[in-house]
């Protein structure tokens, strides 16, 4: 009893010291939309008006340390100023006396030596929110003031981003000055509604023979790009950017998610050399925008940089009606970064240590990549497979979203055949007679059949030699070797290295050329005449040139 009386007196004393509790916040209407949906719907309008300012003005110095700031929006709490309560690595807890920000709202730390953006991830109760930092938190201290911007992370979009490199929060990192534009969009947006999406299946002609013939890309589809180091992945990506710009007038966006800084720098330099990116007065003629979040960045930045790149691509699709190419390198790092964020937030891990929201995180990104009635976003995603285990949850979840796979083979690159696309391992949902037509489908299957038969005969050739093969098998091998070399192609972006002019091959020409090889029309031509050319007319011309040189 004495203990109970002592506790009661302590509680009463604490209540007197604490004073009257603050008045409860007024309740809104009963049928208020969900916070995330409300935030998505109004973010674009708010961003256009408010996000053009680099940062909202800080609260007056005379205000209280734990509050202050003029609230300009009752729902989002825009303008409210809170206080940092706890910093644990990339996780920062912030308390707001009023103007509590909704989930996914961007906060900006005031009076900091660099611009530090935090994104609200959890509401902890007692006016406390848990946030993920988009940059390093070195130098951040308890009590520092934090501004509620009232909108998600908002980035510049439009033609001003072409030829520029920016980070996850839209800041330029190429030392070429500010990105001057009036167009801004939040990175968190809803996927296009069903009524806005185009259901017609069309192929995106790339001008690359091996891709268009054997594993065609769907307009608005998602393509997985598999390949190790040094097999020509970067050159293939740059040629796709170049060809889409020339043939379709479209732009490209490259999102570097959690990859090496050196590779990002090399890609930028190679794009400048090949003319994909132009500097100085001709910058407006650039064909690609770059968004980087390298592997040295905090997990919050790596988890959101893919969304930043996608937002830039969405503007080109929706506002300008473009066919946009979106490159994501590497989509596995996006999943990996979200797994780190999930662990930092204290969520219980799922299979193989991945976040329990793995499918939701990936689906939120992939479902925004689609074709609408205005334009399309076709995504090429480099995919790292951990320990070459295709059943790992990260790549396995990614495969469910892909429409085509392009596999780059080291064995083919060792033969000097570029692009080193494996014609047997690469697949596409578009390889159907209902989509491509009977001629294209039959030609593609015929090419694959000849190459597969050649692959089956290689062991016999290695042991016994060509002389032991039947006449039919010798003919199969001869045609397969010609097809293998005919799948090579000089690229425009490689002209500066090879000296050979690049070739863009129309789809119809590719189909007719390979059908002629299958029918035996060109059995008399030497196989070296099929190497590094465009259409079949060039093969004939090259064969005549070789014959003249041999005769002389």
Swiss-Prot record:
Catalytic activity: ATP + H2O + 4 H(+)(in) = ADP + phosphate + 5 H(+)(out)
Residue stretches spanning the membrane: none
Matches recorded under CDD domains: ATP-synt_F1_beta_C (cd18110), ATP-synt_F1_beta_N (cd18115), F1-ATPase_beta_CD (cd01133)
Transit peptide per record: 1-46
Annotated region described as Disordered, given as residue ranges: 15-35
UniProt-annotated binding residues for ATP: 227-234
UniProt-recorded Gene Ontology molecular function terms: ATP binding; ATP hydrolysis activity; proton-transporting ATP synthase activity, rotational mechanism
Role played: Mitochondrial membrane ATP synthase (F(1)F(0) ATP synthase or Complex V) produces ATP from ADP in the presence of a proton gradient across the membrane which is generated by electron transport complexes of the respiratory chain. F-type ATPases consist of two structural domains, F(1) - containing the extramembraneous catalytic core, and F(0) - containing the membrane proton channel, linked together by a central stalk and a peripheral stalk. During catalysis, ATP synthesis in the catalytic domain of F(1) is coupled via a rotary mechanism of the central stalk subunits to proton translocation.
Family, similarity comment: Belongs to the ATPase alpha/beta chains family.
Protein name: ATP synthase subunit beta, mitochondrial
Organism: Oryza sativa subsp. japonica
Lineage, top ranks: Eukaryota, Viridiplantae, Streptophyta, Embryophyta, Tracheophyta
Gene that encodes it: ATPB
């Amino acid at each position: 009893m004495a203990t109970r009386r002592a506790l009661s007196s302590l509680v009463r004393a604490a209540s007197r010291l604490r004073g009257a509790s603050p008045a409860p916040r007024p309740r809104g209407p009963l049928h208020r939309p969900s916070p995330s949906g409300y935030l998505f719907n109004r973010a674009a309008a708010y961003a256009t008006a408010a996000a053009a300012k680099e940062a909202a003005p800080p609260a007056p110095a005379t205000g209280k340390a734990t509050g202050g700031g003029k609230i300009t929006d009752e729902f989002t709490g825009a303008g409210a100023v809170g206080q940092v309560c706890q910093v644990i690595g990339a996780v920062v807890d912030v308390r707001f006396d009023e103007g509590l920000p909704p989930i996914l709202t961007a906060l900006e730390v005031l009076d900091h030596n660099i611009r530090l953006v935090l994104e609200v991830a959890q509401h902890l109760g007692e006016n406390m929110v848990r946030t993920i930092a988009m940059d390093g938190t070195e130098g951040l201290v308890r009590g520092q003031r934090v501004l509620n911007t009232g909108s998600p992370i908002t980035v510049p979009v439009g033609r001003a981003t072409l030829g520029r490199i920016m980070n996850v929060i839209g800041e330029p990192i190429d030392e070429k000055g500010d990105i001057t534009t009036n167009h801004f969009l939040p990175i968190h947006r809803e996927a296009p509604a069903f009524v806005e999406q185009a259901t017609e299946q069309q192929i995106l002609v790339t001008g690359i023979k091996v891709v268009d013939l054997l594993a065609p890309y769907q307009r608005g589809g998602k393509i997985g790009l598999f390949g190790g180091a040094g097999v020509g992945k970067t050159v293939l990506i740059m040629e796709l950017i170049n060809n889409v710009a020339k043939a379709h007038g479209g732009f490209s966006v490259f999102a570097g998610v959690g990859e090496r800084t050196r590779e990002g720098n090399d890609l930028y330099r190679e794009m400048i050399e090949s003319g994909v990116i132009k500097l100085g007065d001709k910058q407006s003629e650039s064909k690609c925008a770059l968004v980087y979040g390298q592997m040295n960045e905090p997990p919050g930045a790596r988890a959101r940089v893919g969304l930043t790149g996608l937002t830039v691509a969405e503007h080109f699709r929706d506002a300008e009606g473009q066919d946009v190419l979106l490159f994501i390198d590497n989509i596995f790092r996006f999943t990996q970064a979200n797994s780190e964020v999930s662990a930092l937030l204290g969520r219980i891990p799922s299979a193989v240590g991945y976040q329990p929201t793995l499918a939701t995180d990936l689906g939120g990104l992939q479902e925004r990549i689609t074709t609408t009635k205005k334009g399309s976003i076709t995504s090429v995603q480099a995919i790292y497979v951990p320990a070459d285990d295709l059943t790992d949850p990260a790549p396995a979840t990614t495969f469910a979203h892909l429409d085509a796979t392009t596999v780059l083979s080291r064995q083919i690159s060792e033969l000097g055949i570029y692009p080193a696309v494996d014609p047997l391992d690469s697949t596409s949902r578009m390889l159907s007679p209902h989509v491509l037509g009977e001629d294209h489908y039959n030609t593609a299957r015929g090419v694959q059949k000849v190459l597969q038969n050649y692959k089956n005969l290689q062991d016999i050739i290695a042991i016994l030699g060509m002389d032991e093969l039947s006449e039919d098998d010798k003919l199969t091998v001869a045609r397969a070797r010609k097809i293998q070399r005919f799948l090579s192609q000089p690229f425009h972006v490689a002209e500066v290295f090879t000296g050979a002019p690049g070739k863009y091959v129309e789809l119809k020409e590719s189909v007719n050329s390979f059908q002629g090889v299958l029918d035996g029309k060109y059995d008399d031509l030497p196989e070296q005449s099929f190497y590094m050319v465009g259409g079949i007319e060039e093969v004939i011309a090259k064969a005549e040139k070789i014959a003249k040189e041999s005769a002389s």
